[in-house]
Every structure is written in C-alpha cells, then in structure tokens.
C-alpha cells in the first residue's frame, strides 16, 4: 500500500504462531486466504527482512536508498498505542498480543524511549506463546539487556516451558510445550530449539566474534554454581566453565 506496509498477503499462510491457541488472542482474522486489513506480525517480519537486506547492501558497498526508516514510521503510525506504550495487533485494534511486541523489539526498531516499556511487558507476560515465537521473545529480551529474565524464562517451569518437555520424558525437543498440547505433536522438532542458541550466544556469550578475538562477555547469572559446555565455533572449540565462583572461556584449536 502507499505507506509501504503489507496488507492482504494471500500468496501464503500469514504465520503468527502455532498451535492457534497460543497466539495470545491475536486480534486479526488469520483465515486462508487472509482477511481484510493490515496486521502487525507480518509487517514486523517484513521490516526485519528489509533491514537485513539493507545491512547486506552496506557490507557489499552497494548504493541504495534505505526503505526501512519510512517503514518503521508507518508501522508506528499503524500499530503503536501511546496510551499503553505497546504495539497493537492490527491497524484498528486496541489489543496488544505479546507477539505484536516481541518482534519490534527483536528486530531493533522500537524507539529507545519506548524499549523499556515493551521489554517490561514481555517479562510481565512470561511465556504465553508457542515454542516458535518463544525464540524471538528470549532473543528480544537479550537484545534489550534483560539477561537475568532471559535465563529465568529459559529455565523456568510451568505448562509452557522446556522443563515441561523434560518432565514428560523428552530426549529431544517437542513441537509443542507438551505431548498433549497439540493433537499431532512431533516429539523431535527443530523449531523448539531456542535454548541452544540463546544459552550459547546470549547467556554464555560464545559467538564467532569472540572466537576471532573480540571482547567476551558472559551473562550467566551468579546464582549458577557449576556449568561446563564445549561449543564448536569458527574452527575452534570454546570451552566455557563456571566453577567455584570463577567463569572462564578457553579457545582450543581443533586437533
């Protein structure tokens, strides 16, 4: 449409979350084909994609006219509700599903003076999404510097938790939070794998940049007494250890 936002994308499924009962009452009709109007999640993903493309163009020294600033302005006009400090689900809605606030924070286009309110909301709500969107929630909070809350959500219990999978005997990752939470739940599904990247990259601070000599910053809470993990990264092995109050990261060449 004229302001650059997407509406009535009928070429495929407008995925917000799955199963449907974990969309936090997202206030937009997600029928096939999609209903009339402009909704939040697909536009947040679109802006994220445009910003990623612009980053690649910069890295390649290509000349281009940035589109993302105008898209962010249009997104704010359509979905931001100053009376709550949150993003709404659709252009005409007053409801703010957690999904509608996870993605703007994750993709980094929430204005600096609005970030704390959005991050607080994600913490207050806890995990009320499916395993798919939980990845973006944890990553968004990490990018907002809320590492203690990330670790708490990652290791917490309840019906919507990875601990619930373990309590049900999981040896891999389920497609849903529990075997009976979806009628045909796969008991080995990669879209529940948020703990892998979040623990390694955001909590332990092990990234390719660190392996190449950048400053290493761990965000593992002091309450964790012992942890040891070996992570293959950038042609090396990163050995992370927390023991007796000491935290170390040793880079070993693969032999």
List each language-model region with its residue ranges.
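Generic structural signal for hydrophobic core residues of well-folded globular domains
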Residues: 107-110, 141, 203
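Non-catalytic C-terminal accessory modules of carbohydrate-active enzymes
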Residues: 73, 148-255
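The feature captures the catalytic groove of carbohydrate-active enzymes
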Residues: 2-67, 73, 80-134
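Sec-exported extracytoplasmic/periplasmic mature domains
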Residues: 55-58, 73-80, 142-143, 155-159, ...
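Repeat-solenoid scaffold signature
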Residues: 127-157
């Amino acid at each position: 449409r004229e302001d650059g936002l997407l509406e009535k994308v009928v070429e495929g499924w407008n995925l917000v979350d799955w199963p449907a009962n974990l969309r936090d009452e997202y206030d937009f009709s997600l029928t096939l084909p999609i209903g009339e109007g402009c909704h939040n999640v697909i536009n947040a993903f679109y802006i994220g994609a445009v910003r990623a493309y612009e980053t690649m163009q910069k890295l390649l020294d290509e000349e281009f006219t940035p589109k993302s600033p105008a898209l962010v302005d249009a997104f704010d006009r359509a979905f931001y509700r100053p009376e709550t400090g949150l993003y709404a689900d659709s252009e005409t809605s007053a409801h703010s599903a957690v999904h509608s606030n996870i993605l703007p924070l994750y993709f980094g286009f929430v204005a600096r003076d609005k970030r704390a309110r959005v991050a607080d909301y994600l913490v207050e709500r806890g995990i009320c999404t499916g395993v798919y969107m939980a990845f973006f929630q944890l990553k968004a909070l990490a990018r907002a510097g809320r590492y203690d809350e990330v670790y708490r959500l990652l290791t917490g219990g309840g019906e919507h938790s990875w601990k619930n999978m373990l309590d049900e005997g999981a040896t891999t990752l389920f497609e849903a939070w529990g075997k009976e939470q979806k009628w045909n739940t796969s008991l080995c599904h990669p879209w529940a794998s948020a703990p892998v990247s979040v623990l390694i990259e955001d909590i332990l601070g092990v990234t390719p940049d660190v392996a190449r000599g950048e400053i290493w910053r761990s965000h593992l809470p002091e309450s964790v007494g012992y942890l040891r993990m070996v992570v293959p990264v950038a042609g090396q092995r990163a050995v992370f250890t927390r023991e007796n109050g000491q935290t170390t990261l040793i880079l070993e060449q693969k032999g």
